[in-house]
Amino acid sequence: MGTIAIIAAVILGISFMTFVAFFGRLPALRNTPISFLHRLIWIHLPNGILTVDRTLTNGRLTTSLTRLGRHLWYDQHPTILIFFFLLLSVGEYLYLPVAWPHFSFTHKFFGTIAILCPYIFLYLSAYTDPGVINAKTHVREMARYPYDFTLFHPGTSCETCHLLKPARSKHCSICKKCVGRMDHHCIFINNCVGANNQRWFILLLLSTAILTLYGGVLGLVIIRAKIQARFPYWTLMPWWTSTQAWNSGDLDFHRWLLLWSWGLQSGVAMGGVTLLALLTTPLVWGLLGYHLWLVYCGTTTNESMKWQDWQAEMDEGGVYKRRMAADGSREKDLKVEPAWTRWPVEAEQIMVRTEDGKPPRSSHRLPGEGEWEAVWRLKDVENLYDIGFWDNLVDVFLPYFMFKESKGRSPVDEREFGRERGRNRRRSS
């Protein structure tokens, strides 16, 4: 009982803290215990330690810790990537010598594939350019998506990169670069997840989820066979035990746990890795499911937060939309917009928020036509970047797929964009 309790407690603790760290900031979990724990661990607890240190050491300890923490959290470094690599390799080193002789040829074949795939996709996720935007790639990234006039508006410049920001892009404060179709910065791959490597990231999640589930189940089967070879009446789940064995006292719940512990102690290394795999499997599958859901919705982690911010604005009132030109004849400002993009649709609406809660005045010269309509729910807003699950998948796995033919000319006027870049640099200097 002691062995199984310690191993399970440690693994559950690590898994739960990882879940809180990764999911605590999600808009869907706002005002929940998970969000509260995230704020407690990452905001209130550090502030409390800072207050105590200021009282006892005049802040010397927290100054050093803050410098270290700033480097760990806000600078690009491979610490967590190395940890993830070691977690995979050390776990397999402890697991395989005991488990491998028990595998059939089929399990050895598919097991080898399951072991290798996470390493391949980890390398591709970490070392593939996520879609960094610079002077050489700016034209290409501008032609990737049109502005939707809801989350992304033309004419916004990055104050760090001195470039007009393409639609769906974001500047990463860790990588210090703008990234096309930015999803998030992932510390496990020491890289941003963007337009060019999101496919490898999803395949990394899928292969890791399969590996943990496959390895955990096979380890469970081996442990069960070992216990049942000596105690035939033992079953994997206590409620599967025969009524006769349960009623006779040969296998009550306490004895069932003792036999579990005995099975783990006969191969502690493999048993510990099996428990780690089984207990982390829901976390990995949940993360995979979340990212597939984002693909289904035609959005990203970054954009989902923007949508939730819009919902908060709608709850307060003062959000309005109106349609763009129905025939797509809107005249574009080619100084800040691409003439064409590879995307199959153009913006159908513009959405804005007003400070006074009243519709925008005509003097504001905002694009669109017709009357302004108050918006209270996200489902009343069209997501330009959701073109159906299949096409969304194509966009992720074939990031340069042309959904429509090019116009035979550059999507942007290089001279106009060059002037705009020059103005941006002068403003920031």
UniProtKB/Swiss-Prot annotation:
EC number(s) reported in the record: 2.3.1.225
Q: Where in the cell is it found?
A: Endoplasmic reticulum membrane
Q: Name one Pfam family in it.
A: DHHC
One Gene Ontology MF term:
protein-cysteine S-palmitoyltransferase activity
Composition bias of kind Basic and acidic residues appears in 408-421
Q: Per the similarity annotation, which family is this?
A: Belongs to the DHHC palmitoyltransferase family. SWF1 subfamily.
Described by its record, this protein's role is as follows: Palmitoyltransferase that targets several endosomal SNAREs. Palmitoylates the SNAREs at cysteine residues close to the cytoplasmic end of their transmembrane domain. May have a role in the cellular quality control of transmembrane domain-containing proteins.
Q: What is this protein called?
A: Palmitoyltransferase SWF1
Species of origin reads Neurospora crassa (strain ATCC 24698 / 74-OR23-1A / CBS 708.71 / DSM 1257 / FGSC 987)
